[in-house]
Amino acid sequence: LPPDTTTIDLRVILGSATSPGRMHRALDGAIERAAARGTSADLIDLGTLDLGFAAGTPLGDLDDDSAATVAAIESAGAVILATPIYRGSLSGSLKNLIDLTPVPALQGKVVGLVAMGASDHHFLGAERHLRDVLAFFGAVVMPVAVYLNGTDFVDGVPGERAETVLDQLFAGVAATAAALDGVEALEEPLALGAKAVKPRARATG
């Protein structure tokens, strides 16, 4: 890929609940290659953090990594959400972080998607569910997601295809975010634009 002339900071969120493994290694390599092209990116692996459970508690009251992680998303120029497939969908740890994240943190922000499963049977599961959730936030989701499976790795090392599609996604996210930089969203997302519904008066007599 050609050098990247954008100045967008990417945050790569890996929604893993286990110790760093193949997906961590693949994303870490993609970040290094992006840096060589001039794109600044960093990896936040949820498997290495202590995040509170999204139970309505204000972020400032959580004595863990939740507030700092959400702040990293808020300050990002663009975000890449990566998840292993669990039960045909995204991981619970990533969904929990999304539940902790306020709507303005992702509103109008470019988001790329990466998922990984043992086979191709569930390649649309996490993508479909994440697109539904991100539409609620009013995020700008890249039209093509990356899906990796076991055949994309040899002895835990990502192969040529994995590196190529990740590099294309990183470059596409950075370019799209740069193109939209300063462009105000046309409409509020559903989460902010919905009006409260008043209860109907009960009929009498």
Residue ranges and their predicted role:
Residues 2-39:
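N-terminal beta1-alpha1 ligand-phosphate binding loop
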Residues 10, 41, 111, 141-142:
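Hydrophobic/aromatic residues located in beta-strands of well-ordered beta-sheets
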Residues 14, 45, 145-147:
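Residue-level recognition of beta-strand->loop/alpha-helix junctions
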Residues 15-17, 46, 116-117:
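Cofactor-binding loop segments of dinucleotide-utilizing enzymes, especially the Rossmann-like FAD-
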Residues 26-27, 126, 169:
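Hydrophobic alpha-helical membrane-association signature
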Residues 46-63, 154-158:
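N-terminal beta-loop-helix "entrance" segment that forms/cooperates
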Residues 61, 141-205:
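Glycine-rich phosphate/pyrophosphate-binding loop and the adjoining helix
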Residues 61-137:
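Helix-loop-strand module that forms the ligand-binding subsite of alpha/beta enzymes
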